[in-house]
Amino acid sequence: MKPFNIFDSNSSIQGKFFLEASAGTGKTFTIEQIVLRALIEGSLTHVEHALAITFTNASTNELKVRIKDNLAQTLRELKAVLNSQPASLPTYLDINCNVKQIYMQVRNALATLDQMSLFTIHGFCNFVLEQYFPKTRLIHKNPALTHSQLVLHHITNYLKQDLWKNVLFQEQFHLLAVRYNVTSKHTSSLVDKLLASYTQPISSYFSSRVERLEQISLWHQQIYNSLLEIPKQVFLDQLTAHISGFKKQPFSILDDLHHFVDLLYTSETHSSLFSFFKIAETFNFKHRLARYKPCAAFTVLENMSWVERTLEFCNLDRIFNTLLVDLQEYLKQNYTPWLSPDESVFALEKLLSSSEAQPVVQALREQYQLVLIDEFQDTDKQQWSIFSNLFISPKFTGSLFLIGDPKQSIYEWRSADLPTYLTAKSSFSEDKQLQLVNNYRSTPKLMEAINQIFGKISPFLEIPGYLPIEYHALNPQSSETFENPPHAPIHFFFYETIKDQALWIFSEALRLQKEQKIPLGNMVVLVSDSNQAFELISYATIPVSFSKNKSIFHLTETHILTTALLEAILHPENYEKISKILFSSLFGLSLDEVTTKKEDFTIYFQSLHSYISHHGLLATFYRVMTTQGNVLFSSPRGDLIFQEMEKLCGYLDTISSYPYHQLLHLKNFSETGRWEEELAISSYSEDLETLKITTIHSSKGLEYDIVFCPGIEKSKKNKSSSELLREMYVACTRAKKQLYLPISTQPPSLQRSSALTNYVKLEGTQSSAYDLAIHLHQEHPDLFSYSLPKDHGHATTVLNLPLLETFALKVTPPKTIFSFSSTKFLLDTHKDSQSIPYSKLPISKQQLPLGEKTGILIHKILESIQFSLLQDTEYLMSTIMRFIKHTHLEGFEETILKLLSKTFFSPLTFSSQTFSLSQVLPNKIFRETSFLFLENQELWQGVIDLFFEHEGKYYIIDWKTSFLGETNSDYSKSNLSIYIKQEKLDYQGRIYVKAVRKFLNQFEIDDDVELGVIFIRGIDTQGNGFFALNSSEDIPNFNPKAIQKCQAYH
């Protein structure tokens, strides 16, 4: 390849060139000079005819700034010449050139630089599609909505129209609906799951619904003929008896068996033949017992693979994938074909290869006179197809530069591949293959050492089917020198343990800071991944920060913690949201601590609720950190999480001043971050007093005075020898003055494959990295040095750091929050002396056990039951078993089922009407509803078991598992009245009714609210076990301030 020098007038820039730019050779400088030279020489008449494509948005912005600064500097020099002042102009300028004309050309370019086409590859593809193929772009776009909100809108529309029926059977969709049950606290909704997954590629899904229905019909016809020999009742009896040969399941299949056999013996085919998952799971081969005996009925099913077909039919992953594929097609047709950025690349490649695109191809060729494609080593086949189609053709008369370095191709996981790079290179003649040969980054001695290391590998890279890639030594051009006795420019240090390695690095960094006056911020520790970074940080003796260019959602729980904190602040009355953040690493509390201090924390978050509305999210975060900072910093990665939460809170404050808007944005952040690069928050530290730690991949394109490379010693899995060598090259070429390479003292047989051990193997003359270091030092003592573990002590450096400046935030006086639980103590002092001690009543073994645990479990069951499935006995039983398995209630399943059936189907008589809970519409029900309201300057909180609307009236239900006696008559209205007054439940009811009325008033609803108490142990169809409270009853007089120290329990 020919050397290329932009300032050499003999190095032409007109034509098509393949330019290799090794690390530190001034690639970006060369690109900006190519643009300037093209303007000066006239091959580029206007900057709007220039196209530059880079890898990331950050690179695009940097290049634009560099080009702008270069044009501005050149303009100043030209102006100086016009004013007959000393000036420095490019050497390729002809001495007799028209300086005034060039001045006007550069000034015009600077003023109109925004018209230059500067894109990432995805940006370029989107630009072409929008300009020339508008029909393939967004079909519907509402500027008031974000991309995520638009996708959510279309997902909702898809489901509302029941379009799933085109690809799924009703039984399959029912399985999905149960799996993604929105009333469950443990699962996400189907809509949320689809929103989180809509960009994912899908490989495993069902064939078309029509095809599957044909297969079901054919299957049924075949088995129907076999069934003619077995009477229906005999078939059913055999299958029923067959159950005993399998392991017992936590559900009954008797009703399903009757239904299944009915369908089998019907001549008409039903898709639900394969929907009996419980039968298939019961008769699964893996559940067979030793006493299993075959039967004729099951043999028929077995021969027709019914169990296998049913398990496949009910496979939730395939059902979801099938739905997702159809949804993706719907989004492409109704919103945008480009569900992910890469799809725009695929689409443009396909469109440009069609005959109808030739006018577009011609228009693009005519639009651009200069095309610069940077980081070409990271290009894939589709991208190269686009570029070659547009600009390699002789019909493109402008200039083209493909610029890259195969030695720095470390993004194979992003689809970049070297064969594509080499294919592109081979399409250029040898005289058009250029290279930058001068290094401006590293000191001459360090560059000489780097040349020595990589010059030993020949060929540097070898790809089957292509000419080998050689390492070409670079000419050092830096005028800077650096002396660092006793170390040579590349220093190998040996270590025994990771702790030894970390302490050596931190000790050496501190020495360089003191003796060489190099700020810690100009040094970097390059690691393989975040785990290695955090391990090193755990031994840090100096200030360090892990700098990464990833989204904050990539490694830590920052997103989760920030969301949980904001939800707790905005909903201080919601115990579940408060508990979530209290259990997290931000507070680190135990279950007992949260339970006993729940009211205190509600008061605390209520004070933060007021604070955030006046001071913003970031200030509120700092306020929380004044008490919780030590807890967070003592947790793994706590310092990094603090930095990220700080940055995220500050970012959200710039988005909106309304906390609820911030929470909405935060919940959609992780998904939208994939589309909007400006939303990705980098934790890259600019602090000069902090040693940086970053990954080798993140360091690409950056440079540092001092580089420590423990990342090349970390074992790597599933990486090719070629990629390991390229990673080592990238790591070593980040250094400007000094490079440190660690070597483990473990025997080679115990060392796993790493970039360094891979290098030793490729170099071939030494048996270990240890031997290599010794050999290099003996061969070039002025370039390489080494130190053994004994050369440094393990003395811990004691830093005399100044005391941290702290600040205190004004504490807002908290309000006491009252509840029925906290006031009950005082109310109990008014109890009637004739009250009945129900807790001492005898209880038979047939009754549910007494105690708080029983009440909690029954409440959990009632909380989770879907009202739409109350008629489904098997569903109710499976729900009950799910909660009571391995508890003290195991064995009471039938008793609980009977009690629940009575609870939901017994008539409840209120003053306005009589009805059962089974008649209430599921979509008009709120369960476990938390409230917090202000009454007479006092805050009241609580949780309502059930709140619903029925036929235009509003009702509250409170569940009670209190034991009043063995018979239903013990739960008569007269007995309940005594118990309710005794336990002050009428007082509790008044609090709940007040809370609901305040809630309804927000919607200008002034209707009355009635409250009923259901005693689950005694409810029946005769009116026992239910008591409707009189809402007009007066509240007993009391002074809540007298009981402020009482805790609230629910």
Swiss-Prot record:
List of catalytic residues: D958
Annotated residues for binding of ATP: A21, S22, A23, G24, T25, G26, K27, T28
Tagged with keyword Kinase: no
Region (Nuclease activity, interacts with RecD and RecA): 814-1050
Cofactor(s) required, per the database record: Mg(2+)
Catalytic activity field: Exonucleolytic cleavage (in the presence of ATP) in either 5'- to 3'- or 3'- to 5'-direction to yield 5'-phosphooligonucleotides; Couples ATP hydrolysis with the unwinding of duplex DNA by translocating in the 3'-5' direction; ATP + H2O = ADP + phosphate + H(+)
GO CC, one annotated term: exodeoxyribonuclease V complex
Amino-acid positions noted as binding Mg(2+) in the UniProt annotation, renumbered to this chain: H859, D945, D958
Gene Ontology MF terms in the entry: 3'-5' DNA helicase activity; ATP binding; ATP hydrolysis activity; DNA binding; exodeoxyribonuclease V activity; magnesium ion binding
Alphabetized SUPFAM superfamilies for the sequence: P-loop containing nucleoside triphosphate hydrolases, Restriction endonuclease-like
Domain note: The N-terminal DNA-binding domain is a ssDNA-dependent ATPase and has ATP-dependent 3'-5' helicase function. This domain interacts with RecC.
Stated family: Belongs to the helicase family. UvrD subfamily.
Role this protein plays: A helicase/nuclease that prepares dsDNA breaks (DSB) for recombinational DNA repair. Binds to DSBs and unwinds DNA via a highly rapid and processive ATP-dependent bidirectional helicase activity. Unwinds dsDNA until it encounters a Chi (crossover hotspot instigator) sequence from the 3' direction. Cuts ssDNA a few nucleotides 3' to the Chi site. The properties and activities of the enzyme are changed at Chi. The Chi-altered holoenzyme produces a long 3'-ssDNA overhang and facilitates RecA-binding to the ssDNA for homologous DNA recombination and repair.
Protein name: RecBCD enzyme subunit RecB
Species in which this protein is naturally found: Chlamydia pneumoniae (Chlamydophila pneumoniae)
